[in-house]
Amino acid sequence: MSEEIITESIVKNFGSAETSVGEKQPKRKRSEVRAEKLKARKLQKAAEIVQKQKENRKILKDVSLKRLSKSLDRSLPSENTIDQISFNHAMSEEDASGYQIGDKHKNLLLYKLSSSSGSVFTENLYSTIQEFLSAQKVDIADSKNTYVFGSTFDKKSHALVKTSDSVRSLKYGSFVKACAPLFRFASGIIKAHAPHFHQALLKLELAPSALRFGVFPNFSLQSVSNGYMSMESNFSSIKYGFVVIIIVGELNDVELKIPAISHSLKLKDGSILVLRSSLLHQWYSLPKQSILYEIRLFAMSSLWHYEKNKSIKIAKKDDI
């Protein structure tokens, strides 16, 4: 069963509604009963596959969440520092089928989905992104192009507000609509592999009339050019949360390096990563004249400082 089917099963198929004790249940058609049984089998199969993925997780015995979370407060590594690190690479068969990396306590750090899992969602997204950027009257290849959408907490007014980029209307609606299936897919992956964090995201109160992107309160779009560091940690979710990264572009020989765990991986159009926020320091290595667009789904760290959101409990060690 593919990851697309796994996620679809998790997102959509949750059995029939409960009925009150003593309430007479209406007679159901055979087709409805068969459909419900099929849903149950899909859910069971999906759960078995998720469990198998967890059991095959590669464990880093010298890495812990506690140590990694402290790296959020450090300065971003320089290009010279990156060059001095010996990076581990995934095998080609692992990259094709997908793999997971965990810390010494088996907590999920990185989930690289199979190389084909996101391509169905990004097939026409490259041109949609370029149309959006052109409408903003910016150079579509400029690595300074960074847009952050959704809710944030304004410390001066002590209120939840939309990010400044959320008010842009030119091509924004068509861009978000094109991304909607991708948002749902990413949310299903989080629900399967980080259920506690998924529930916490659903509980977050957002700015009035602000959109939710799947389960996430924020998403960003960033142009990435040669040797450009990815989004800084102050945009991340809380230390023990997750972000989902989706890569869009006509790519060849693109590498993403993650210094915190000395790991690197190859990227292509439709590559999807689930990443601990503690690992947000990343370094893209692109050939000259190349450009990719990074879509990131996350929860702004400021949201957790809003009074009504402070009470939301986050398990440091999710049941994953």
UniProtKB/Swiss-Prot annotation:
Residue stretches in coiled coil: none
Residue segments, region Disordered: 16-36
Gene Ontology annotations of biological process type: ER-nucleus signaling pathway
Main location: nucleus
Subcellular location, record wording: Nucleus, Nucleolus
GO-annotated cellular components: nucleolus
Keywords, alphabetical: Nucleus
Keyword Nucleus attached: yes
Keyword Nucleus: yes
Signal peptide: none
Biological role stated in the UniProt entry: Induces a stably inheritable state of calnexin independence called the Cin state when overexpressed.
Protein name per the record: Calnexin-independence factor 1
Species annotation: Schizosaccharomyces pombe (strain 972 / ATCC 24843)
Source organism phylogeny: Eukaryota, Fungi, Dikarya, Ascomycota, Taphrinomycotina
